[in-house]
Amino acid sequence: MEEKRHGGAGRVIVVILILAVLLAAGAFFLFGGRVRVETPSFSTGYRYDRAKDYATLDTFPVEGVTADKVELHWISGRVEIRAAETISVSENFAGDDAQRLRWRLDGDTLIVQPCASGAQELPEKTLTVTLPQTVLLKVDTVSADCALTGVQTAQLDVDSVSGALRGDAAVTEMLSVDTVSGGASLDLTAAPKKVTGNTVSGVMELVFDEAPGTVKLSSTSGSFALGLPAGAAYQLDWSTVSGDCDASGYQAPEGRGAKKIKLTADTVSGG
């Protein structure tokens, strides 16, 4: 069944409850193009590529480093990211050297790993990062929660297995959130041109202070809640066998929106 719905003025919470087969998995998008992904392996501890190129904070502090992109990898614990005038990286851990974070510069990209390559039995740690608004951001976590405070960036890409994503951010170009069972609750204070949200069983709530460009969502058994600004018009392309969509609260003349926001949700089956 394919269905198209249109809405108009008023503050809206569009709640999409989906039970489906995940249509897209394993894709990584960063900064609008193909990305070099340093995928870790857990078969013999946490391992990643080019391990010899990484340094500890004791050897080479990050303070004073400039980068156009920041890529954060973290396993468990918490990741806190705040807006600032300069880049800084720290962790609340002073234990075994192999379990301390590593970092390196790859051209204009700063990459942070949670430990030495090959380390095992990693403790829960808190990673704290500050970023200026010109920096593009990529975050990969396993079970670590991620908190954003006043982050300003053109592109934000977050991938998590079971960690939660919370906070506020001003994203102007691209927002991508992918989880397995982790939840996300974001207050978006700018208007990103492109938004994608994918989850297997997580709950995502995205509240926009300004109308975004396009929003595309997909899920297996998770749910989505979208908050759009007062007066925003939208067009929802809803393709499903038996999914549910609640767009109560929207009223539009003759049931038509102005296509200012395009929302797309694809499912196979649901209840």
Regions found by a protein language model. Give the residues of each.
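Short linear S-[DN]-x-LW-Φ motif typified by the pepsin-like aspartic protease active-site region
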Residues: 28-113, 126-138, 145-151, 155-157, ...
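Short, well-ordered turn and helix-capping elements at secondary-structure junctions
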Residues: 93, 116, 133, 143, ...
